Amino acid sequence: MGDFRSRHLAQNIESLNGKILKIDINNNNHEIISMGHRNPQGLYFDKENNFILETEHGPKGGDEINLIEVNKIGEDKLQNYGWPISSAGEHYGGKSEENKKKYEKYPLYKSHTEYGFVEPLLTFTPS
């Protein structure tokens, strides 16, 4: 599920925005699989090797392919992919004066792991 232009919700565990969900179709229960996503576009589940590949639109540039390790689901620390704190992309309009407050709140660090997030398998800039 995307962040619906409410960036901060991608890092809020109480919100479903910016999360990948596992939904039980028999009882409609759900489980958060991962968080920190901007705009997920596609999922591929490799049942044999127990992983998910997720494609995601970044902001201006910074599209991602993320590896979600299914065997880590349910561990104490949820897999977090960093949005809106880390991204290979930039905010639309770049680092202009009008975007100054946006970058202060959502800096889009180029490293994910340096800030405690899972690094994408691949990023595409420009995209």
Residue ranges and their predicted role:
Residues 2-127:
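Beta-propeller domain segments
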